[in-house]
Amino acid sequence: MEVGVTLAQEAKTQAMTHTESRAHFAMWAVTSAPLILDLSIDLADASVVEANWDIIANREVICVSQTWSGHPGYLVKSANNTFVAACVAWTCENHTLPEYQIWAKPQPNGTFAVLLVNIDATGPSGLTNLIVPLSELFPPRDFRGG
């Protein structure tokens, strides 16, 4: 997981914006991946800690990560509309990506944590009234015998 990566810290990859870092942290949480902070808060540059504290200390995101209800988060919906992301890192190629993805993670009492990831920097088209059929969140099951 990367939060607060700047070009000066990692020359081989493109730096993530604060918004991208927030989304990345949330993705790790919703997929139940371990949240490991590779930063000694007492030894780190105070400006790095301050700039990212709202991400790494977000109690709600950490709670989603730490809550286990039998299943990690899963992809519910991926946009049909795509865009081409031009890669600026020296080892990377352009990629066709969906404009957005919706992820869900089961929580206690039959609730779900839902994460909308806006992948396209210009904003997804037609996302003002997003409809996700319940059958996509809750796959139908036949509980009758057999």
What does each of the following model-derived ranges do?
Residues 1-40:
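Glycan-recognition surfaces
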Residues 6, 57-61, 139:
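Generic surface-pattern signal
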Residues 26-93:
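Catalytic cores of secreted or luminal carbohydrate-active enzymes
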Residues 28-38, 91-140:
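Carbohydrate-binding surface patches
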